[in-house]
């Protein structure tokens, strides 16, 4: 029988532990976890994401500040704000919502964030620690970290003998996801737009993780029976059954046809999405504890690392 992984429920358990960890931090140090979120421009999707992150930060009891900047903000102005937040001892995490307007150099901004405050896990220092197998002293990119929680819940901490396929090679997800799987002893294949005969490669995988932005690309006849399927895609497709010009969210996996063949599968929405925000909150409270020379509770550590 297929297990439909409930991302909202898993995220809720982690968020509860984060709230407790923040309360313990405040009791020991007199300070809350401080998270600053920066958004530039008026993209509706970005504002929706930032709103969800800010609300969750407040639910966790954080000191949360949102900086909403106009689209015309210059590189110098944005860099100045990041510099100011880097120097603020009350801010433990800095998140710059991507994408930025085209005239801004996003990579330069991300790399200007102090690594210990880079709660998105995108700084080269954090990426480098992950690449060398250091999962303890850096901050791990949120979506791969959330997907890995699901994998561990199904397969445990040691993935020895399992074949894992990551479809997508982005710096934001595909590469860090592959590193996490490698660190857990899986045999990892990364597929991408130049991969030939992807379906046959997929049929050999015990774990399939799709993150390419192609609606319902992974079909049932691609899957090995009993595979674990983690769908990271978020795509809007026409939904005429809902009315004119209406859309619905789907992932990169054809969920309805793939679910009967999988042992465990994440839905879209309600799968990886809630976990991304939960892992952002986890990184923030971890950063706050480290800034005070403390470690987070064993309960939270077990929930996020298995």
Swiss-Prot record:
It catalyses: (6R)-5,10-methylene-5,6,7,8-tetrahydrofolate + NADP(+) = (6R)-5,10-methenyltetrahydrofolate + NADPH; (6R)-5,10-methenyltetrahydrofolate + H2O = (6R)-10-formyltetrahydrofolate + H(+). Keywords: Amino-acid biosynthesis, Histidine biosynthesis, Hydrolase, Methionine biosynthesis, Multifunctional enzyme, NADP, One-carbon metabolism, Oxidoreductase, Purine biosynthesis. CDD domains: NAD_bind_m-THF_DH_Cyclohyd. Belongs to the tetrahydrofolate dehydrogenase/cyclohydrolase family. NCBIfam families: PRK14186.1 (NF010783), PRK14188.1 (NF010785). Catalyzes the oxidation of 5,10-methylenetetrahydrofolate to 5,10-methenyltetrahydrofolate and then the hydrolysis of 5,10-methenyltetrahydrofolate to 10-formyltetrahydrofolate. This is Bifunctional protein FolD 1. It comes from Rhizobium meliloti (strain 1021). The lineage of its organism: Bacteria, Pseudomonadati, Pseudomonadota, Alphaproteobacteria, Hyphomicrobiales.
């Amino acid at each position: 029988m297929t297990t439909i992984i409930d991302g909202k429920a898993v995220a809720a358990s982690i968020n509860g532990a984060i709230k407790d960890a923040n309360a313990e931090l405040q009791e020991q140090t007199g300070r809350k976890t401080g998270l600053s979120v920066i958004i530039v421009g008026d993209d509706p999707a970005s504002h929706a994401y930032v709103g969800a992150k800010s609300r969750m930060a407040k639910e966790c009891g954080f000191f949360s500040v949102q900086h909403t900047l106009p689209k015309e903000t210059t590189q110098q102005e944005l860099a100045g704000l990041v510099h100011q937040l880097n120097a603020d001892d009350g801010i433990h995490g800095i998140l710059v919502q991507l994408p930025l307007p085209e005239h801004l150099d996003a990579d330069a901004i991300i790399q200007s964030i102090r690594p210990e405050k880079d709660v998105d896990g995108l700084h080269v220092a954090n990426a480098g620690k992950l690449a060398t197998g250091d999962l303890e002293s850096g901050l791990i990119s949120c979506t791969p970290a959330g997907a890995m929680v699901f994998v561990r819940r199904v397969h445990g901490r040691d993935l020895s003998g399992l074949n894992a396929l990551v479809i997508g090679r982005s710096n934001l997800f595909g590469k860090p996801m592959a590193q996490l799987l490698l660190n857990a002893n899986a045999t990892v294949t990364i597929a991408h737009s130049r991969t030939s005969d992807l379906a046959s490669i997929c049929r050999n995988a015990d774990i399939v993780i799709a993150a390419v932005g192609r609606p319902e690309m992974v079909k049932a006849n691609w899957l090995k029976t009993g595979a674990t399927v983690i769908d990271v895609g978020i795509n809007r497709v026409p939904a005429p059954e809902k009315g004119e010009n209406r859309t619905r969210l789907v992932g990169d996996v054809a969920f309805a046809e793939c679910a009967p063949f999988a042992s465990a599968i994440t839905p879209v929405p309600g799968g990886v999405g809630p976990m991304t925000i939960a892992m952002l909150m986890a990184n923030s409270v971890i950063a706050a504890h480290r800034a005070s020379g403390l470690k987070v509770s064993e309960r939270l550590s077990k929930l996020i690392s298995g």
